[in-house]
């Protein structure tokens, strides 16, 4: 039983790390509102301009594999 609880805890932690939650450090305000004076283009929109939209990609078989590949792609994009 304790292994199940540990596994669920690890899965919850990994899921929270891989989710696309809003972060205070990125200049967002509570409630998902942006500052009205700045007109920033989001990173997702920049990717769409180059034809790399995540919603335009064909669906992959494994949901977990999809999450891991998207996380790796974001990390590589940050390093560029």
Curated annotation (Swiss-Prot):
Family under the similarity heading: Belongs to the GnRH family.
Major localization listed first in the record, in broad terms: secreted
Cell location: Secreted
Protein name: Progonadoliberin-2
Species per Swiss-Prot/TrEMBL record: Oryzias latipes
Keywords: Amidation, Cleavage on pair of basic residues, Hormone, Pyrrolidone carboxylic acid, Secreted, Signal
A Pfam match: GnRH
Record-listed Pyrrolidone carboxylic acid modification sites: 22
GO molecular function: gonadotropin hormone-releasing hormone activity; gonadotropin-releasing hormone receptor binding
Record's signal peptide: 1-21
Tissue: Expressed in the cell bodies of a cluster of neurons in the midbrain tegmentum.
GO biological process terms held by the UniProt record: brain development; camera-type eye development
Modified positions (Glycine amide) in chain numbering: 31
InterPro entries: GnRH, Gonadoliberin
Function noted in UniProt: Stimulates the secretion of gonadotropins.
Remarks, miscellaneous: Teleost species possess three paralogous GnRHs: mdGnRH and cGnRH-II have been identified in tetrapods; sGnRH has no tetrapod ortholog and is thought to be a duplication of cGnRH-II.
UniProt GO cellular component terms: extracellular space
